Amino acid sequence: MKKKIFIAGSGGIGEAAALLLREWCDFELDLILGDISQENLDKARAFVLGGSMKTTSVETVVMPREGLSGEMKAAFESCDCLLDCSPGGQAPKMAGFAKDFGMHYANLTEYVAETDKIIDLAKDASTGFILQTGLAPGFINVLAMSLYKQFVADYGNDKVERIGMKVGALTAHAHAPHFYGFTWSPIGVATEYVKSSRVIRDFEITERPALSDRETIVIGARTYEADLTSGGAADLPDYFAGKARSLDYKTLRYVGHYGWVEQQVAGLPQDERLPDLLEKLMLQAIPSVEDDLVLVHASVDGFDNHGRRRMIEKAYYVEPLEINGKRLRAIQTTTAAPLCESAIQLLRGDRKGVILQSEVDPESFMHGKFVSRVYSIL
């Protein structure tokens, strides 16, 4: 089998996805990298090719901010799948290209409005569209689905008390007063701290303010704090309404961080400028750090068919990875691996239309080459 994938966006996640696909795919796979910046493209191509023994091609295409160039049209006509690593606001545009040119499509964005547009656009598509398939949303949701299916099989009850999904992109060390270091997009962090979170309470979907339900949790004998943030639940609230008394997505941090954030937010205007103002303030106080780690924890808690309380939980701790002498940060691999896994499943299968995170097969996804290698799943 020989296939070709177009990767839109050549930043940290795009170049990581390209490297993983080229080095780990077990069939012949050519790549085209697309970006609005030729400089980004040159850097990403050098990153993917450097030190590699693979001989498959890696082409580049500059993508105009508006419209469709002849070079892009030719590239799309030659590709089987489009992986969308562009900014979330571009997702409907990229999905439209995928549908128009008969490509499969997978993306990362948690943006609700953009996701709804793609669901409408792709409902009658002749190819598959896997949405929100990064780390969170993405891997964490499939992990939760896997644990829920295991709970039902083991304990004979399909109604549960709580489903918890938690992810932390952290640093190995953290210093007072903020106990944090940026390992990914600062504006992404600021936004998830102020946008509301979609949850289930008393079996019904509702919204809660970000950072309004803090808890302390011990994972692997270390203490963390977790609180509600936006975006990570994907479509699981819709799937579990009526099945779970409580469901939420929370971001993991070192103890003390959220108290510091609350102090900063309290001194800022509570209007549409809040994400940008919080980002600016945090950038002045918090360093950006290359040495990162990603912590993932999911749990399903409920009663078995004899009325005894049970819990199934799973945690993964992911550190940076080196391939061909190139260091990939944990946030890169944990985000890119699910995207790559989705691409391979689309290319090998016959799925059509929209595939949401609750509809991904946990068994094949979790034990696929990309996800299992990055997350060390046996």
Residue ranges of each PLM-predicted region?
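Conserved Rossmann-fold cofactor-binding substructure of NAD(P)-dependent oxidoreductases
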Residues: 65-77
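C-terminal catalytic/substrate-binding lobe primarily of soluble NAD(P)-dependent oxidoreductases
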Residues: 150-378
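N-terminal Rossmann-fold NAD(P) dinucleotide-binding loop
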Residues: 14-15
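Rossmann-fold NAD(P)-binding glycine/threonine-rich loop
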Residues: 108-129
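Beta-loop-alpha module in the N-terminal Rossmann-like domain of NAD(P)-dependent dehydrogenases
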Residues: 71, 82-98, 112-113
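Helix N-cap at the beta1-alpha1 junction of Rossmann-like dinucleotide-binding domains, i.e.
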Residues: 36-40, 112
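Conserved N-terminal Rossmann-fold NAD(P)-binding element of oxidoreductases
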Residues: 5-11
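N-terminal Rossmann-like NAD(P) cofactor-binding module of classical short-chain dehydrogenase/reductase
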Residues: 76, 80-84, 105-107
